[in-house]
């Protein structure tokens, strides 16, 4: 299990995450919802090690979560133009390879093989050499997911990954994300402004308001009134 206990993060006098406690299960995509400013992004950044909480613990299988154990898919993909899809995926291996290899563009044959496999995982097997700027928005987000998988994480996070996509494309990207979490037996957490897009792939819902959890329930037990209640808070 991924156990979050008493997680708190302050910005000056403002409390972004307020004593949050929950548990996530492996192989299941948890959908994180709430108004803008509810604390969703701060929670993800604490889980990814981009920010340090002021209090609380984050443990995976009873051991502290390390920053290298979590990978984050960003809202806008954060890909590098001028590089191919597979080159962007290979950037996910930087924590495991010497920096000089990236400087000269050299990666081990094993890393290249795995990168191709990760593109296959997200439905882009034939796009390895395609420049990322030539890909559609949905395809770019799939490359972002493949790059995150290349990090070999225990925890796969995504911060509003479909915010700029049309609903049909957004659903397909979320399906890819959920499949990756299931097939690689990861802990998955994705924040969304459009919770309806995830109704077929969510295994669990977390709802935040004013830095606190106001919903923590399996998807099968969540209805539209519960979702609306999250947005009525705060």
Regions found by a protein language model. Name each.
Residues 56-68:
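Conserved ABC transporter NBD signature motif
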Residues 101-127:
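Conserved ABC ATPase "signature" region
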Residues 156-159:
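Catalytic Walker B motif of ABC-type/P-loop ATPase nucleotide-binding domains
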